């Protein structure tokens, strides 16, 4: 029982950081520019559900896949660390894109953003998947495994709420 709180804090901080709902928000707003509230809410709902289900699949099947392919947990920890380092390094090297799309292309592209790129890889990327597999491996008791699942659900619920908060234009926004 004494390991439960530190494990829960580790799970929450690592998943909230890797999921990065606050960093995803500007991308979400840019990609859904021109959509109405109903369309944005549907995209947010679909993206968070797909992200949660994808992460649960890897959380429960990760160790089986390791055994099947002969990968050790420690080797995967090292590879996962490199992935997380690369993600962080890429964030430091952010570049502005001058890509322009026609209105028809934007609508076609925006119809699919809930799965790719919003759910996978932004909300449920390789870092989050590696983290879920490793934390499930570390969870030695049923209560720790339940805590991990609950924390993952909590993080995606918070992500859903953060994105939902920004689906409606602000009443103080002069553009609306």
Kindly give the residue locations of the regions a language model identified.
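Small-residue-enriched transmembrane helix starts and helix-helix packing motifs
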Residues: 1-17, 94-95, 101-119
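Juxtamembrane transmembrane-helix termini in multi-pass membrane transport proteins
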Residues: 7-57
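Structural signature of hydrophobic alpha-helical transmembrane segments
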Residues: 10-22, 74-82, 148-159
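Single conserved hydrophobic/aromatic residue that forms the stacking wall/gate
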Residues: 166, 171-176
